[in-house]
């Protein structure tokens, strides 16, 4: 039987290390943590210098254990799609099963857990990670992806509803005449029309459009891309924050198939790409995500623009 590589994905304080230990206890898998390696070579797991050296050591140990037939757990935040794909390419020469577990915890629970941790990560750092969050998908090269909901369903519901209420704010940006919640509701209606024309799922396309900007209240700043004060509001990272919250909402209590939850999160995190990439990069990106997801992303992009 092939060894199993399990990569954990999640922000600080989400419970990744606990999940890693639970898996290791059942399977005997070897855990490799970037925090542990930093503590080993620098004497401080918070030390962020020379991350390349930390990664090289971790990769070397992961490859060694997989070649020796051991199951391996890679415990780090692993929030970035490009870096995850790069890691999978680095172990492509080893015949193993590639699994990914996304650990999702409400920010409220994370804040409470931080109070009990010996090693505390500031919530400002957690917020930055939420904005950087990119949900894994099978186009990255995984054999299996699981969502590990680390908060209770009732806490997920409360956290989602709290953020939804926060969306009743003006955009304060010339691209939008509607409030954030008004824009999303309008986009949801537009998405139904575009999905009907494309002969594809109405319910899920409407749902994604209805929450695609839900991260905006937590990301609103009056600072431009260059860090200069701005009279208009900007929303850096709202797509990542929103993607994360789509998975908070899509907990087991809501009975939404996991594969659909993953695709929905990816649509939210990628809905700004056509503004952020040059034509060549955008073409490569569209090829990466594949025709089915691109079809749904196009519907979301059109609905988003039509609801401005």
Predicted segments — roles?
Residues 160-188, 221-232:
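Active-site flanking loop/helix segments enriched in acidic
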Residues 50-96:
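Glycine-rich phosphate-binding loop used to anchor ATP phosphates in small-molecule kinases
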Residues 5-7:
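Short hydrophobic/aromatic beta-strand immediately N-terminal to the Walker A/P-loop
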Residues 18-70:
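Conserved substrate/cofactor phosphate-moiety recognition/catalytic segment
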Residues 192-307:
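Divalent metal-dependent catalytic cores for phosphoryl transfer on phosphate-bearing substrates
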Residues 15:
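Conserved glycine(s) of the Walker
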Residues 94-113:
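Conserved phosphate-donor/acceptor-positioning beta-strand/loop module used by diverse small-molecule
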Residues 9, 108-159:
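Conserved GTP-binding G-domain of TRAFAC-class P-loop NTPases and closely related GTPase folds
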């Amino acid at each position: 039987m092939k060894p199993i590589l399990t990569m954990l994905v999640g922000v600080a304080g989400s419970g990744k290390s606990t999940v890693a230990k639970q898996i290791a206890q059942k399977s005997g898998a070897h855990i490799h943590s970037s925090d542990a390696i930093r503590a080993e070579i620098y004497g401080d797991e918070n030390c962020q210098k020379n991350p390349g050296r930390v990664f090289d050591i971790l990769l070397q140990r992961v490859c060694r254990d997989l070649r020796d037939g051991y199951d391996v757990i890679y415990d780090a935040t692993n929030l970035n799609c490009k870096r995850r794909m790069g890691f999978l390419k680095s172990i492509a020469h080893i015949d193993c099963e590639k699994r990914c577990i996304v650990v999702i915890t409400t920010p409220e629970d994370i804040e409470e857990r931080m109070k009990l941790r010996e090693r505390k990560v500031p919530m400002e750092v957690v917020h930055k990670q939420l904005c950087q969050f990119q949900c894994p998908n099978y186009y990255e090269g995984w054999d299996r992806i699981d969502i590990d909901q680390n908060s209770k369903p009732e806490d997920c519901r409360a956290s989602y509803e709290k953020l939804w209420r926060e969306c009743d704010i003006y955009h304060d940006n010339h691209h939008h005449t509607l409030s954030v919640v008004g824009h999303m509701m309008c986009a949801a209606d537009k998405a139904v029309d575009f999905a009907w024309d494309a002969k594809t799922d109405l319910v899920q396309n409407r749902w994604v459009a209805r929450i695609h900007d839900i991260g905006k209240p937590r990301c609103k700043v009056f600072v431009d891309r260059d860090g200069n004060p701005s009279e208009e509001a900007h929303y850096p990272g709202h797509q990542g924050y929103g993607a994360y919250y789509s998975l908070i909402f899509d907990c087991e209590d809501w009975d939404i198939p996991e594969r659909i939850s993953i695709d929905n999160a990816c649509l939210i995190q990628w809905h700004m790409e056509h503004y952020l990439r040059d034509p060549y990069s955008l073409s490569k990106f569209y090829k990466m995500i594949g025709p089915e997801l691109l079809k749904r992303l196009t519907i979301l992009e059109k609905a988003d623009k039509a609801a401005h």
